């Protein structure tokens, strides 16, 4: 079963803040309706009460958006992800157990197509507000492997170590000068060297660990490192809005990998 309750307090805080943000949004929407027509059964008997409820909900919602972030430092690296992003402020971890060998699962990670990942196209459609655009992770063609789409639209392969770990990374934010003059080759070393203000990098991995005969624990973790306070504040608000959808996509991706790996097939 896929899980999001990995990685300790920072991840649980991300879940809590996102839940609170959307809850306050619902309260604000209901209070706004009560400003037009009071809703006595919800305690909003007058427009004055509705206005107070709306203002409180808006204030609390803003509070969740600007809540301070927690920085995590990896003390003892155990994965390629740990080496590439040893310091980060935002993360999410999901895992599943698959009845197949690591070799078989690893081969399938980047062959799972967009159409095989439930809700992916729906959530990316919502994220881009229904606007059309070129093929990308926000507008993925259904018949292509999602990894292929990512690597052709701003993501980079940072580590490919079968059958143990695959790492992809992208630039969430970068100064104009850096975007105009990118390095000729972007590797894990490029990401590890980023410390100048104005950057935010997102790196995700798929890590496999055998836990028995033809039984594997597959984990995916995403980390975001923002290099300065301004970028951290901006990304914190964005992260708390997109976190639920991001988590669903990763859980559905794991589920698609699991389903594909456990299908009857020629032995590895």
Which residue stretches match the model-derived regions?
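Beta-strand/loop substructures that line and gate deep hydrophobic ligand-binding cavities in soluble
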Residues: 74, 187-245, 257
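Membrane-embedded alpha-helical segments of integral membrane proteins
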Residues: 8-38
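A conserved amphipathic terminal alpha-helix motif
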Residues: 30, 234-268
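Transmembrane alpha-helical segments that serve as helix-helix packing and pore/cofactor-lining elements
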Residues: 39-44
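Hydrophobic-ligand binding "helix-grip"
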Residues: 16-19, 45-54, 64-70, 151-214
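Hydrophobic ligand-binding cavity/cleft-lining segments
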Residues: 55, 61-158
């Amino acid at each position: 079963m896929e899980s999001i309750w990995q990685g300790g307090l920072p991840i649980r805080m991300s879940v809590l803040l996102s839940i609170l943000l959307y809850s306050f949004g619902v309260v604000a929407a209901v209070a706004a309706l009560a400003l037009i027509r009071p809703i006595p059964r919800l305690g909003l008997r007058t427009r004055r009460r509705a206005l107070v409820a709306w203002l409180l909900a808006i204030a609390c919602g803003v509070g969740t958006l600007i809540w301070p972030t927690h920085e995590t430092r990896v003390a003892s690296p155990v994965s390629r992800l740990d080496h590439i992003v040893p310091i980060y402020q935002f993360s999410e971890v999901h895992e599943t157990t698959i009845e197949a060998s690591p070799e078989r699962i690893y081969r399938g990670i980047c062959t799972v197509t967009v159409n095989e990942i439930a809700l992916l196209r729906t959530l990316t459609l919502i994220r881009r507000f229904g606007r059309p655009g070129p093929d990308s992770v926000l507008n993925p063609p259904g018949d292509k492997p999602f990894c292929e789409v990512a690597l052709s639209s701003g993501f980079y392969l940072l580590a490919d170590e079968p059958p143990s770990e695959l790492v992809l990374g992208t630039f969430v934010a970068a100064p104009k000068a850096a975007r105009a003059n990118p390095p000729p080759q972007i590797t894990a070393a490029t990401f590890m060297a980023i410390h100048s203000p104005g950057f935010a990098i997102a790196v995700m991995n798929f890590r496999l660990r055998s836990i028995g005969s033809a039984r594997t624990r597959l984990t995916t973790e995403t980390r975001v490192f923002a290099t300065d306070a301004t970028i951290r504040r901006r990304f914190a608000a964005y992260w708390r809005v997109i976190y639920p959808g991001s988590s669903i996509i990763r859980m559905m991706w794991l589920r698609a990998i699991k389903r594909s790996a456990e299908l009857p097939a020629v032995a590895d």
